[in-house]
């Protein structure tokens, strides 16, 4: 065993990292999934005609693992994983992944793998799963020995290289499917006090995926798991005070300043028709009308030829009757599916009238179509004025009408308020009219003040009437519709809603990523957001600490260690400081440490373990496998604790 290089495999449920123990980084990193693409029936039929050896090679090449999957979204529905949560359950898939690993590491074509292996496994891994793994490694691949360990404890071992003389820690391990709170005292795992939260990176990504799908249902195909993974990895962070940040996001100024707009891919449509001038657009309409008339004329001529041929046949039948050839006449009627002589005469008369109408239409020329009639009824520019000047004049009139409509709308909104200048002026006029009494003559009769003789006198009623613009508004609406109709007909660049700024095609394919960047990772502290009834991470830490005496609690919180993929979230350390400060006694001390490389620290810690002098004593050999049982393994400081399965 001495002198042989150790192969380290960090077999994570999200990513697998493989390399030699004397390397500084893994030689192979890949997503721990595989797929079998759908077969092409034509290719399959062609392959069946080949030799048996060629078929075997093709079948082995059908399985795609890890980095060999070029487009993971195209086969997302067919992805397979050997894991169920964080425990291996599908051993056929695991064997295919091992084949991929050993092929990439240069063992292709060898009968056995003659190198010791360090392999990570789930915390409290069931004996049955370890039994299956031992059988796979020893009997299928012929390895000499294997050492099993927990990824979180390997990560802590790597952290101990920088923090010397540390034997106590509270390890918080963030996995893809689960999160564990692991207490370690005097360098030993306190397995009976470990607690698990069934929320991990998978749930965070899936939660964001569903949120964005509900927010943008028109972009379901563009919202993919891969895009959501990138958003989670690069742009999400954990809020120190979640409720306070939610209040900030409710303010429009904060929203506009911090919103992130994600541009989705789209195919830009070139608006060629909108780039045409008015004359070019009108010419296109005339060409289209001519083409339609030509098509109609050709159809009528074809129909006329058919009617003439049919009339010729029916006249021949009529001649048989006139020539007293009744037998031939009866047989001909049956062939043409005509009942009697009267039916034949009726058909001849109908076809004759149809031919006559067609000939009259051909002589009189084509009748203008409905589209042409509408074009003829459309107003034309006045004599002596160019079309461009006429359209510009109409556009100016249209803008004036829109201005009047906007002014009336503003006036209505002001009159609806009591303390505006318009409302106060209206009340002043009403009160002055009420106080103005008519003068009386000497005989007591009221003297006529002449009000109404001037048309301007009636404007006072318009000033005091809140809705005096109904008739004017109706007239303006009619003119506006007329102007829009003319402008839309002549000017291709005119839009009926030109006063509304158009939205670009790129803006229609944008995702606004705002409050989701704190809402999504918050599920670690509030699992109820995704329907999980378990306690959050802060409550879980408090529960684990209460399982120990006060002195041991203090030893644990003096070195809280964060590892795993989700430990990369910004703000996680600050949030845990806030949570620990709330749950710990007044003025008690605690410290939180983050892994320098959360996703690689487990593999690096396993490499440290391979270089220790006592590494040989932690290896489970083939002889141990045969003598102590298939589920047996040797314990060490970074491994699970072996509890033999009770015998019946």
Swiss-Prot record:
Using the UniProt annotation, give all residue ranges assigned to the region (Disordered): 34-59, 357-385, 403-455
Stored SUPFAM superfamilies:
Actin-like ATPase domain
Keywords on record = Coiled coil, DNA damage, DNA recombination, DNA repair, Nucleus, Phosphoprotein, Transcription, Transcription regulation
Localisation: Nucleus
Show the SMART domains listed in the entry: ACTIN
What Gene Ontology terms for biological process does this UniProt record contain?
chromatin remodeling; DNA recombination; DNA repair; regulation of DNA-templated transcription
- Annotated coiled-coil positions are 277-311, 340-364
| Family annotation (Pfam families) | Actin (PF00022)
Q: Which GO terms describe its cellular component?
A: cytoplasm; Ino80 complex; nucleus
Highest taxon of the lineage: Eukaryota
Give the modified residues of type Phosphoserine.
Answer: 471, 473
Enumerate composition-biased segments (Basic and acidic residues): 414-428
- For the keyword Oxidoreductase, the answer is no
What CDD domains is this protein classified in?
ASKHA_NBD_Arp5
| Family listed | Belongs to the actin family. ARP5 subfamily.
Listed under subunit, the entry gives:
Component of the chromatin remodeling Ino80 complex.
Its biological purpose is as follows: Proposed core component of the chromatin remodeling Ino80 complex which is involved in transcriptional regulation, DNA replication and probably DNA repair.
Name this polypeptide is given: Actin-related protein 5
Origin organism is Drosophila melanogaster (Fruit fly)
Tell me what gene encodes this.
Arp5
